[in-house]
Amino acid sequence: MEYHPSSQSPQVNPGMESQQGGYTYTYQQPAPPNSLHLQHPSILTRLPPLSSSVVSPSLASLPPFTPTSTYHSIAALTPPSYPQSSSAPSNNSYTIVPSPHDPSNAYSMHHVLQNTAPQSVPSPSPIEMVPPSPPKTGSNNSAPVTGKTVQSGNALNNSGLVKRQARKRTKTGCLTCRKRRIKCDERKPICYNCIKSKRQCEGYTHFPRPSGTFTASRRIPVSSLLSEPAPHGLAGQPTHPTFLYYIQSVAPSLCLWDACHFPPLSPYSSFSSIYWSSTVPELALRNPNISVALYAFASAKRHLTDDAVAFARQARVALTNITTTDSLLILVLLAVTQLYIPKSDIQLFNFAVDQVVKFDASLMTSPSDEIITYLLRRMFIRQVVLAGIVKPLASGLNPLPLLKCDLPPATTPTAVLDESLFHLGLRKLCHEKGLEPEFTKWSKNCPIDKADLPRLALLMIHAVFTSPVSLAQWVELILQNPDPTPAIHIARACLLAVHGVVDLGDLQMKVEKCVQSCEERQLQATISNFSTEVAQTNSSALAIGCQ
């Protein structure tokens, strides 16, 4: 909506009632997504709550902005309200929403937060949005101008509007698809084109919001959420110390663990960074159940046991059916919290293990749901491992079914070793102590670099809980390493781990041949070095004798 002083109106104080007749109101439709109108700073951080119909915690479920004639108003820096003249009553229901800093505390977002589902948000007509234009002051009493835009400093002309619409098509897709000049399906946070072509999705510069709001067409960074108080009606508190701890410590740690496992350019890697650092905090600000579960998890990481117990009890009431990735996120956060509190909820933990393993793939509505489920499984297994390293898990907790989750096969020796990290704590869980003397004895007989011992131990532990078929394939792959020495130790560790469990005769023969070959080369190298040293000593002695 734009208002401009009429050339025929007297120049008087705009606060006077008589000035109402001195303005011409025009309506321009549709409003451009990046309007140049000034907006209140709080509008840029106001996020509507997720509707119950949204099944994905990512932004993929939000509908794209369409150039249809919908204009949903949010109070920005609207012009001052001019009271209606008593002589010219109006039936217009348009009212200006007060600022959130209004001392009257009358600020309310009920007109924004009623229902964000796109199918239930009506499109108000221009009559509902714009107050009727009073008749021009003059002798001809002509009809008010309602369809023509009056030019002003902040108004967009028609050509500018056309440019904005034409440019919008290239700014809503991901950066990778825009560089490739192909149509992007705009799934968030990674489009399906990048997943299918195995390219790194560089993300979006435009994240559409539900059609019930009209905000700046840009993705709200988490840093801006931390600098402003939480808008009225949202669940999370961006300035809460526990929330800040998650943003500054927990989320980077989760991203780092995933980055160590996934290839740098894989979609999983970029998805993980966006999901833990941005999507989950934004969900916590909108959804009170996710917020409480996140606070419980972060409090446990901060070693605030009492807070973790209190938050976990509060969130436990909200658990019903696990049918979406949102509810799965809540369940995993609460289950991980049980690993760090004194009196663990064994029933909740084992229920979470069962749900994570058996989560119905038919409920997934997009590729992002599948990736989110995979990330949550990974995170759950990893937290069990890390907790088991610190202390034995509480009696009754049974995380072993997590090992049956489908994991992608390792393709490099480094991936094999990294894969074993997820199962490091399971040795204590299963009390597999019989392997340690064998491994220690073998290590003493075949000394290696001490820096390799932890990685070899990880692989040996992992081999206990790995199927023999994949273990044999991994050993075959490791033996192809150009440097045979670490490969031999890794293969021997695997064979010790599965000794008496499965017959790997052929594989053992290959390992023994590799060991023998390596020992022969080491012996030859030792003899060669000794011969060189003897020759140098003799030549030095001859030189001294000649002097």
Swiss-Prot record:
Keywords: DNA-binding, Metal-binding, Nucleus, Transcription, Transcription regulation, Zinc. The keyword Transport does not apply. Pfam families: Zn_clus. SMART domains: GAL4 (SM00066). It is found in: Nucleus. Residues 121-135 have a biased composition (Pro residues). Residues 174-201 bind DNA. GO terms for cellular component: chromatin; nucleus. Residues 1-18, 136-160 have a biased composition (Polar residues). Residues 19-29, 83-94 have a biased composition (Low complexity). Disulfide bonds: none annotated. GO terms for molecular function: DNA-binding transcription factor activity, RNA polymerase II-specific; RNA polymerase II cis-regulatory region sequence-specific DNA binding; zinc ion binding. Residues 1-41, 80-165 are annotated as: Disordered. GO terms for biological process: galactose-specific flocculation; negative regulation of flocculation; negative regulation of transcription by RNA polymerase II; regulation of transcription by RNA polymerase II. PANTHER family: ASPERCRYPTIN BIOSYNTHESIS CLUSTER-SPECIFIC TRANSCRIPTION REGULATOR ATNN-RELATED, TRANSCRIPTION FACTOR. This is Uncharacterized transcriptional regulatory protein C15D4.02. It comes from Schizosaccharomyces pombe (strain 972 / ATCC 24843) (Fission yeast).
